[in-house]
């Protein structure tokens, strides 16, 4: 409940209550309120439930109407009540501020009739002295002019601006629109947009005083919207909605808190009473509030009503009539003209009886609404036409004879055709008055077509680059790997010559002159140069990746070993070498090693034959911005260079040489082992002794054909084995055969012993059983 009963601050005779200050003192007692108070007013049509809303929301006790007895004026003049209790969804423990609530006499009441002077002044007073003005309206009133008090608000805005608009402070008033009986069919956002548009339109039409010509509605007011359910039919939801509304009056620090500092008048409470009385005196004496005349108001209301009815009928017929014709220009334009003329004719028949200036003003507004509605269909038709024409263009470009028609020619012809047909359709709408201005549509169309052509050009370029890349990359890789796997001292000269020739061969079809290319898709010289540069970047990156991926430590060691063995194992004619002495091996070793190491430095650093480091003529990566990025450290703590020419670090070079030395040393040792048998000299007297002692056997062998044959076979076998140094494999075979024979013999002996042991055990078991039987 309120702290005190409400008092009539301004009575129905427009007199300000002189005991207001005493009332405030009674409400606050001995407390020093200072600036910690707030003023709220409610404004709206008579019998719309304003007092009821205040009583439920702020626990006040304003008089309310008993609808079961009679609908009549309850609040007369302006009443004031004090409260600290706001109905909220949660309990607030902190000290609540003092709130003073003004219940303003309802507008459009039958008791005052056409005398609207008091309701205008009361509304203006409420705006002038309040922080928050609650505008109470029913959902069905939105869109009306009188029913939702828009005409009154316009007058109040105008006079408020003339009286208080020149103040230099930043004071504002919050207009809180409380939409009653909101059932939710129409979203609150849609309703708020409608009211906001009406308010903004009213503000632009105001007669502003000097110095305020450029002012905006939002320089003086903030707008908020809240929907409340039906109090009788949805009582629980209504109560919950009111509590949610109450949260915004007490929840400080939240985004939806209504009592913002810029709304407060920054006056002590006793100063506010003086300020309020002075405002009422100024409003009461101002004669400009007696505007406009009832005739003009009626004309505006009725013409707006007729306009809305005509527009609603137009919209109701529109979709059904237009939908089947959207693809046919002739039928569509005829139907649009027919619907528009029917709508304007209906408006003219009824609205032309009112004041001509108001009638023409509303007719122009109706015509604008019709054109706005029709423009959506026109835009939809033109967009559909654009899509169709664009599909035709893409088909023409893709199916063109590439041998006779270039991409540029095909696109240019298609673009000209599209523009011609599009402009013809747009002119048809314009001539019939269905399209007021075509500048925006033309600009949008031009931008759209340019963007689509750019996309088509990009796709064509991407396809060309893809074809170039498909051939260029594998060719470069194959050629480079082949040259590096069989390197010479001039391998980098060969690689760079092959690199340039491969690029040139793949893009020769687009070359117009030296270092100038035209990729034949309608690009400028600089754009073509950029594409050429990108191709070179692709080629350089491929070369860089191929070289550094291939020339790893193991690969370089393998290349050096192959070069060593080519000279060490084979002579100049390519025949295998047969070693006789160690000196011969050592000499060949030195020559082969020198031959292998000739290319070691070449494979470590990419330089030309004249000792110039190979440096790419294009940036290799986006992050290349200076020398700071040329050196990096790997996971093992080794520093590397990002520069293309630097292949091996000093540490890696030492690693390569160590592995290479170990491998070639093993090769040399194997070769020396092969001639060990030739170093063993048999004494000559052994041959004489063999001849003397074995003469008889020799004669016996010669005389026996079998022995001769075996001797020849064994001799040939011995010669082949000795000639090709196969004693090692023969020894291995013999050892393997002997081992297998030994294993077989052991298995047989083991089997024999086991079987013999089993037989003995069998006999012993029989003898043991016989002895047992005898003992028994």
From Swiss-Prot:
SUPFAM superfamilies: P-loop containing nucleoside triphosphate hydrolases. PROSITE patterns: G_GB1_RHD3. The keyword Endoplasmic reticulum applies. Cooperates with the reticulon proteins RTN1 and RTN2 and the tubule-shaping DP1 family protein YOP1 to generate and maintain the structure of the tubular endoplasmic reticulum network. Has GTPase activity, which is required for its function in ER organization. This is Protein SEY1. Its EC number is 3.6.5.-. Interacts with RTN1 and YOP1; GTP binding is not required for these interactions. CDD domains: GBP. GO terms for biological process: endoplasmic reticulum membrane fusion. One of its GO terms (molecular function) is GTP binding. InterPro entries: G_GB1_RHD3_dom (IPR030386), P-loop_NTPase (IPR027417), RHD3/Sey1 (IPR008803), Sey1/RHD3-like_3HB (IPR046758). The gene is SEY1. GO terms for cellular component: endoplasmic reticulum membrane. It is found in: Endoplasmic reticulum membrane. GTP binds at residues 44-51. Residues 703-705 are lumenal. Its main location: endoplasmic reticulum. Belongs to the TRAFAC class dynamin-like GTPase superfamily. GB1/RHD3 GTPase family. RHD3 subfamily. Keywords: Endoplasmic reticulum, GTP-binding, Hydrolase, Membrane, Nucleotide-binding, Transmembrane, Transmembrane helix.
